[in-house]
Amino acid sequence: MRPSITPRAGWLLAALLTVALTGWAPAVQHPTAVTPTPTSSAVTKAPARHFVSRPDLTPPVITATTADAGLALAPAAESADVFLGPKDLDTGVAMQGELIVDAHGQPVWVDGSSTGTFDFREQTYQGRPVLTYWAGASSSYGHGDVVVLDQTYTRVATVTTGGDLGAHQADMHETTITPQGTMLLTSYPEVRADLSSTGGPKDGWVLEGVAQEVDIATGRVLFEWRSLDHVPISDTFQPLSPGQGTQANPFDYLHMNSVSQDGPDHLLISARNTHTVYEVARGTGAVTWQLGGRHSSFTFGPGAAFAWQHDARRQADGTLTLFDNEAPPTSSRGLRLSLDTSTMTATLVVQYLPPAARAAATQGDVQVLPDGNVMVGWGQEPYYSEYTAGGQLLSDATFTAGSSYRAFVAPWTGTPTAPPDAVLRRSGSAGTVYVSWNGATQVASWRVLTGSDASDAAPAATVPRAGFETAIPVKHPGSYVEVQALDAAGTVLRSVVVG
């Protein structure tokens, strides 16, 4: 059971759907990921929420697809939140930017000012919870920085690349903070290379995959790994398209999409376009083994092979998790493997399948939660799901359109510096106050005070918080109306005078 951080009502129990362990079969080759840009104002918008107190915010409606409609996370996750980065306006998604929703899909914090967010999540930095996300210019790769926010949603750090790469060259695929106060970053510099092994020009251009470990406090680069020193271009499975391989259109032979710690001495690097997870020695950068691809160090057992994968992570029990974009022919999956380095075999432990076929050509992640459950974000497909460790589907939810590079679950406590927002709509002698507080997680109820002025204002109504925005009927609102946010103990957290 995760720790409770905010009063949230209970909902219906999601039906358990058993996920069968089936074999793997290869599917068609997927294209390189591209983040679309808006192309038409005539795109039909997906369902969005609208608020009287915050008309500028239009987060997507989260809909449960599991049997007991209304539940977006399993009961054990009632007090945790989901972190999403909806994007791709040309698909009709309701907003782009950072989005936190609760276990039922109700908005907690909405930042719709972004042009597209990647890898938005809760992490720990210097012993405190923070929010992190990548911001910059992107297509299938990006140039930008990683933003770090504290619990008041104030920027406390900006992390970027260094060394020969220079600043602002961080790609959007990885933003992990380590326990040592460093961040693991990826970058895609354009480099001259011989592409004759792929049918391209001898004097061509590629996107090299670079991993950096950067000290957040100082910006110092502590470790760097460059793919062309270790992975030949001929290892790619990505076809060279006509016109690719030039400086204007370099060939993405590797497509590095995750970097994670593998004990104190190694890193795991996932490369989509070589179908490989590499274990890399921190000291030398040497590849100690390869999982998958043309030169796999491991033999795969039934159902264990993968392709075009994302988000490879070593778990506390020694297993390796990843998002297999090309699992069975019609569906992607979350994957958990056991690696035996004495026999060099990779064995399927469990796979996490959607309730119906769901092929995510790009993006996606697998997160093992503290209670052992598993969260799967479906990348290009606008869904997220929670499973038991053994593969039983507990909940599945959709935000209808667009995509979210990854999806995460974590407890979060937010205390915004900005005050609540409130609007009074009068109807004759009565009225209704609409109030919200974007990002505040400790509000249990709202109290309305009214009178001729502040000196004689008296309580007129107290109601429980009812989602992101609460509507409060007031029988006889005076010329002065104040709304107070109360925590579970009845303490006033903040107040706002309705204009």
Where are these regions (language model features)?
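Intrinsic disorder/low-complexity segments
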Residues: M1-P3, T37-P38
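Histidine-/acidic-rich catalytic cores in large beta-rich domains
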Residues: H30, V34-G499
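Secretory targeting and sorting signals
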Residues: R2-Q29
